[in-house]
Structures are given as C-alpha cells and as structure tokens.
Amino acid sequence: MSHWQQITGGVTAAKGYRAAGITAGLKASGAPDLALIVSDVPAIAAGVFTTNHMCAAPVRYCRQRLQTKGTAQAILCNSGQANAATGEQGWQAVLAQADMVATALGFSPEMVLVASTGVIGQPIPLEKMRQALPTLTANLSDGGGEAAARAIMTTDLVPKQIALEAEWEGQTIRIGGMAKGSGMIHPKMATMLAFITCDAAVSPHLWQEMLQRACDRSFNQITVDGDTSTNDSVIALANGQSRTPAIAEPGAAATRLEEMLTAVCVHLAKAIARDGEGATCLIEVQVSGASDDTAARQVARTIASSMLVKSAIYGRDPNWGRIAAAAGRAGVPFDASNLAIALGGIPMMRHGQPLPFDPAAAHAYLVQQAAASTDASGQQSIDHPVVIEVSIGSGSGRGVAWGCDLSYDYVKINAEYTT
C-alpha cells in the first residue's frame, strides 16, 4: 500500500517553489509557450537526458551544468522551437536565456537550467523572449503549476501534472511534477520533457541515482512512435524546504523517497503515452518470467512499440500473434514453449500453444477500454489501459511498459506538423 496521497498543485505543490506560464509570441498559434519554475532557495539538481547524438543545445548545456555544479534554482522552458540542429547560434541562445533569467531573478546564470521543445532547426526568438520575461517573472506564484504545464505543450492535447504528499518524521514531504510529450516518444535516457520538484533534503549523488532508477521504470518504458527525441530531458530539484531530516545515504528513508519519486514519474509517463498523437487508448504491457527485471522491461517495451500491435489495438482486433512475434524479436532469449499471452485477462496462449477464446469478448474488451480512456467530461484517463500480459518463463524478472494505439490521425498530425 502506498504511503502517500495525491494532491493538487503540480510543480508548485512542494514547499518553496513558484511557477508561471505565459504566451510570449514564440508560437504562431498564440498558445502559451514560455514556462518558468523557481525555487526560493538553491536546490539539489539531478537530470537524465536523451542519448540521441543530435541532442539539442539546451540538453548539452544542462548536462554540462549538472556535471560541474549539482545545484540549480530555476528552470526556463520554451515550446515552439527545439533549438536542436542550430549550431553555435543555438548554444549562444541557451547562454543568453540563462543570463536573462538570472538577471531578472537576481542570481548567477549557473543556477538556471534551460529546456526547449518544438520544431527542430528553428532558432530561439530571443528578443520576443526577452520582452516577455518581465511578465513571466511577475506571474510567478505558488499556484502557477498548471499555467507552466500548459506553456510547455506542443502537440499535446492536455497538460500533464501530478503532486504527492507523505507524512515524514512528523513533517510533510511533497513531490510535484509536470511533463509534456505526445509525439517523437521513445526515450532512451533518459519530444518529452519532465520537471520534478521536491521539498526533501537529499544528497546530490543519492538524488541522481534515485532519478535514474525512477526513469528506467517510467519514462524509459514508454513509446508512442519509436522515435527518440533530440530534447528528452527529466530534471528534478530538491530544495530541503520541508525541514525533514536530510537523507544522505541509502536506507529506509531513501527507499520511501525513491518510491514516491518513481510514482510521480510513472504517472507522468503514462499520461504521455495516453496522449500520444492520435491515440485513443493507453496500452500497458506486463511481462513476467524473465531472467531479471531488465530483460522483462526490454520485452515489454518491444511489444508496446510494435506498430502491428498498436494498429491491432486501434482496430480492436485481438490479434495475439503480433504480440508473440514482438516478444520473440525483443533480443531476450526464451523458450517458445514457455510463452503465455493474455489480453484483458483472457488467456490466448499457454505453453507456446494457442488457446481457444471468444474473439467477440476480446473485441468487446478493447472497445470498452478505449471508451473508458476518455471520461464523461472528455478528459483523458490513464486508469483504464488495454492490459497485455506476457510470461516468457519461470524467472523472477518482471517489467512493465506503456504505449498507445496507432490511428490514422497520427499520420495526419505528423504529415502536417510544419505546414
């Protein structure tokens, strides 16, 4: 049973954080496009970033910054321009962004992290950003989490945010997060971005290790289209403002905090997968029986990323053969005679042999889950995924991955992205 409860507020739920999101004119659509998160005090900062060799200038900047100085006090994020494949001009733009935020807030540029998302190859409109900065900083508030979450959206249909609260040594610890992502989602960190705020006090090396493991179980286990972005970034701040005892070494307290951090990351990851471009439902692939968890996660992610599996789910077609084929090409050796597959609890294969099942019932399950993926108010839901269960043997390894179905709208959205 979890030891926390979900609360409102997103990145500003944790103590000592303010945020803002505004329209700076960076997008032709006039949608919000500039977000800022600020900690009242310097915070321990950890980051996990894309492995794409064409990584964007802000990714290179943040990676370098966190290697030399593991603290930060502000995160600036624009949407509309990725600042990737922009050469020296892009690098200088990142430095200018950090400098203008630092000047406005009164601290060193080294305390500012920068992120971007949008069209690759387009330069950052620095002058528009500079003109908008006074409005952005004036809008900073401890209720600005949702505005910030909306300002980092691109093809996203909904903002993605969460906050958790737990009682801790007679005090309260909170972790908040926001993310964006809808297309070009196949992170290897680690386009997707996630920003996490925490008011616990934790040592830098422990915080980085916690974030890496949390990402391995969440953001690195989602896929929409198999493309790894140039800008994938997860940045987590911990400012110690909860006044709880500092967590300096592994132990019970560190385990509890990591579980809470992982829960935030999993929620945001599932929200990204559900909001995949053109998607109508969330897919959850559960794999068991592997030699270890890493192998299980690899099989799960391969199945979740299969275009044939995704297409079948969109067509509400219980085609288990595509699931079996995807499992077999995951690069994880297993005995085919041990393979078992179930869809929505309906067994379809056991001991490597097909089982008789009612196709109409399986089809009805897929229809039901797709309908439940959008609630009565029209909001997306991550609580009713299409569940695919796969067992590949008798090992103790388990893993989960999330994806979405593949619809005609995915092609339409991406065919018209810059036109």
From Swiss-Prot:
Keywords, ordered alphabetically: Acyltransferase, Amino-acid biosynthesis, Arginine biosynthesis, Autocatalytic cleavage, Cytoplasm, Multifunctional enzyme, Transferase
Sites marked Involved in the stabilization of negative charge on the oxyanion by the formation of the oxyanion hole: 117-118
GO cellular component term of the entry, any: cytoplasm
One biological process term in Gene Ontology: L-arginine biosynthetic process
Molecular function per GO: glutamate N-acetyltransferase activity; L-glutamate N-acetyltransferase activity
A Pfam family it matches: ArgJ
Active site: 191 (nucleophile)
Enzyme Commission identifier(s): 2.3.1.35, 2.3.1.1
Cell compartment(s), UniProt: Cytoplasm
Pathway it works in: Amino-acid biosynthesis; L-arginine biosynthesis; L-ornithine and N-acetyl-L-glutamate from L-glutamate and N(2)-acetyl-L-ornithine (cyclic): step 1/1; Amino-acid biosynthesis; L-arginine biosynthesis; N(2)-acetyl-L-ornithine from L-glutamate: step 1/4
EC top class, as a word: transferase
Catalytic activity: N(2)-acetyl-L-ornithine + L-glutamate = N-acetyl-L-glutamate + L-ornithine; L-glutamate + acetyl-CoA = N-acetyl-L-glutamate + CoA + H(+)
Binding site for substrate: 154, 180, 191, 277, 414, 419
Keyword Acyltransferase in annotation: yes
Site (Cleavage): 190-191
Quaternary structure annotation from Swiss-Prot or TrEMBL: Heterotetramer of two alpha and two beta chains.
Biological role: Catalyzes two activities which are involved in the cyclic version of arginine biosynthesis: the synthesis of N-acetylglutamate from glutamate and acetyl-CoA as the acetyl donor, and of ornithine by transacetylation between N(2)-acetylornithine and glutamate.
Family (UniProt): Belongs to the ArgJ family.
Name of the protein in question: Arginine biosynthesis bifunctional protein ArgJ
Gene source species: Thermosynechococcus vestitus (strain NIES-2133 / IAM M-273 / BP-1)
